């Protein structure tokens, strides 16, 4: 039976830190407009959804860049929605320099590529399948994030873009699958002090009859419905 009583003596130091910090354990996300509404939990999760082209990927990466620049956090990226390894690295370079990749007078140069290598390779680890023919599940990625360590230390965050690109062993109702897998994720984040950020696309978003614009999606619009809301106790962001 997979049950145990948690011994306070094993948790004493963690709880004392929890008390001193007011129970927060969160970092400023880097957006003044979100201050007091959204913070980056070191042992939490963030799920991002939004209409097509609303900037979900850009928003997520901006948060991660700020966490690296200010707090020194490291991130594992699994992002087929961005594209190939080269396309992901290009996006990281553009964010690092805040300049165009090429084609303009002030575009990133060959020397810039070299100068940024150490920083990007330290804080952003681009992940891919070891065997393209084999499935990769979200649990595989979360477990790998918790187990990975190199000369620069552990990885603090797993960024998935997007949920649809992973293998999901549903075998029945999708909401029941999500209840299981998201509960696993939440417990793992707290246990291992990691942050799991996921981009999940809505199934479809109708146009508002009055504004003639797409309605802002919520958790019910993602495949699996309200399980996303109940499965994300820390942070849910929609655009």
Regions found by a protein language model. Name each.
Residues 2-98:
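The Walker A/P-loop phosphate-binding site
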Residues 28-31, 85, 135-142, 178-182, ...:
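Amphipathic alpha-helical transducer elements in NTP-driven molecular machines
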Residues 35-37, 62, 181-239:
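Phosphate-binding/switch region of NTP-binding enzymes
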Residues 39-41, 69-71, 117-119, 147-152, ...:
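Conserved catalytic network of the ASCE P-loop NTPase/AAA+ motor domain
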Residues 50-52, 62-63, 79-82, 128, ...:
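Active-site proximal loops enriched in glycine and acidic residues that flank catalytic Cys/His/Asp
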Residues 71-172:
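Conserved inter-motif catalytic segment of the P-loop NTP-binding fold
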Residues 126-127, 175-176, 224:
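Acidic, glycine-rich A-domain
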Residues 136, 154-206:
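Hydrophobic, well-ordered secondary-structure scaffolds
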């Amino acid at each position: 039976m997979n049950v145990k009583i948690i011994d306070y003596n094993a948790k004493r130091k963690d709880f004392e830190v929890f008390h001193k910090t007011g129970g927060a354990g969160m970092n400023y996300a880097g957006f003044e407009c979100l201050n007091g509404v959204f913070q980056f939990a070191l042992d939490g999760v963030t799920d991002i959804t939004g209409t097509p082209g609303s900037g979900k990927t850009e928003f997520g990466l901006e948060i991660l860049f700020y966490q690296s620049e200010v707090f020194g956090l490291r991130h594992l990226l699994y992002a087929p929605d961005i594209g190939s390894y080269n396309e992901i690295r290009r996006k990281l370079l553009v964010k690092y320099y805040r300049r165009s990749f090429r084609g303009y007078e002030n575009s990133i140069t060959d020397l810039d590529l070299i100068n940024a290598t150490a920083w990007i390779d330290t804080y952003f680890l681009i992940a891919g399948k070891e065997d393209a023919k084999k499935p990769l599940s979200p649990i595989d990625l979360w477990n790998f994030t918790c187990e990975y360590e190199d000369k620069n230390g552990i990885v603090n965050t797993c960024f998935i873009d997007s949920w649809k690109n992973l293998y999901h062993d549903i075998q029945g109702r999708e909401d029941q699958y999500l209840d299981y897998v998201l509960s696993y994720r939440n417990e793992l984040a707290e246990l291992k002090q990691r942050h799991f950020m996921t981009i999940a696309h809505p199934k479809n978003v109708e146009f508002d009859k009055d504004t003639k614009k797409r309605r802002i999606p919520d958790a019910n619009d993602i495949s699996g419905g309200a399980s996303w809301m109940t499965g994300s106790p820390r942070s849910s962001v929609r655009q």
